[in-house]
Structures are given as structure tokens and as C-alpha cells.
């Protein structure tokens, strides 16, 4: 697999787009757009990204003209990216920006909800299976690789008798511990790399 899909490269090459801020890293929050989904479990990636933007005292996310995405500079060399598509098509907003900036998957940090972790737990990894997460599936398809970094925020499995789609669209508090810990994990990834960040976060 290549780091960015052929289709995304073609889109980045021929679509008329203004310059993006120079960046070496992308920090991607996964979720669904719109007030209906704003506070749901499936949107903890958005919540974490918002927390990071506030903590770094950066400008709010704004539309990136010519892309299906919102962006803002999170720190020097770090661009926060949020697809304006629904979760299942997240890669369509992210991959063309990665292609335009020449950013490999190894420097794309994706923050997302994780059913297979207890609520509040955070785990970091590079690559691996998408575990049925449609946002990750879209990113993998559009980037052409699984080798992006993942900040996984535990939301637990639904109780017996409750369907997963209903469960992930239930509301949660924006200040739950997993979101804050995930924001810390992103900062550690950027500053110290994956191994050091895992050592610091996985013991908590």
C-alpha cells in the first residue's frame, strides 16, 4: 500500500485550491458534523480536537476552500484537520490535504472512539485493523495504508440488548477523563514520539 491513494493524489493535483499552511503533521478528529451528533460517543474525536485547539489557544476550525475539511494551525508545523463529510467518508476530507502537503501516514494522528476499550481508557498505536470502525476504514481506503497513528478513546461496548449504532450516538459529557487524557496523548506523540507516549499513557 502507498501512503496516499492514487485517487487522492490526482484530486490534490488538479483541484483548484488555495495554499494550505505549511505542516509536517496532521491531527485528525473523527466524528459526524452537525448539532445532532455534537455530544455523542461517536464524536469524542471532535471533542478531543476541540480541547487541543483551546489548550493551544489557536483559532477555531474554518473551512479549507477546495477541500471537504475544516482546518486550523494547532502548533508550528501541526495542522488540525476535520472532515466535513460524515464519519463513513472521513478519508475524503483528510487524504487530499495529506497529499497536497506531502505528509506521510506516519505523521497523521487520528483521534477516535474505541468500543473495545473501557470508558475513559486511552491507548495509542500505529496501524492495525480498523475493528469495524467506518471512519478508520475510509481513512485507510483513501490514504492507501493503515500506518497512521491512532489515539483510541475508550467508550466501552453497549449494554446487552442495545444496538451499537444507537449506543455510539448517545450523548456523553465533554469533560470525561478519556478526552482530556487523549489530548495529553496527542501532545506527547508530537513531542516525544509513539513509544514514549505509549509508556506515559498506557499506565493510566
Swiss-Prot record:
One of its GO terms (biological process) is protein quality control for misfolded or incompletely synthesized proteins. Its EC number is 3.1.1.29. It is found in: Cytoplasm. Coiled coil: none annotated. CDD domains: PTH. The record marks 32 as: Discriminates between blocked and unblocked aminoacyl-tRNA. It is an enzyme of class 3 (hydrolase). Keywords: Cytoplasm, Hydrolase, RNA-binding, tRNA-binding. The record marks 113 as: Stabilizes the basic form of H active site to accept a proton. Hydrolyzes ribosome-free peptidyl-tRNAs (with 1 or more amino acids incorporated), which drop off the ribosome during protein synthesis, or as a result of ribosome stalling. HAMAP family: Pept_tRNA_hydro_bact. Monomer. Belongs to the PTH family. This is Peptidyl-tRNA hydrolase 2. It comes from Corynebacterium glutamicum (strain ATCC 13032 / DSM 20300 / JCM 1318 / BCRC 11384 / CCUG 27702 / LMG 3730 / NBRC 12168 / NCIMB 10025 / NRRL B-2784 / 534). The lineage of its organism: Bacteria, Bacillati, Actinomycetota, Actinomycetes, Mycobacteriales. The gene is pth1.
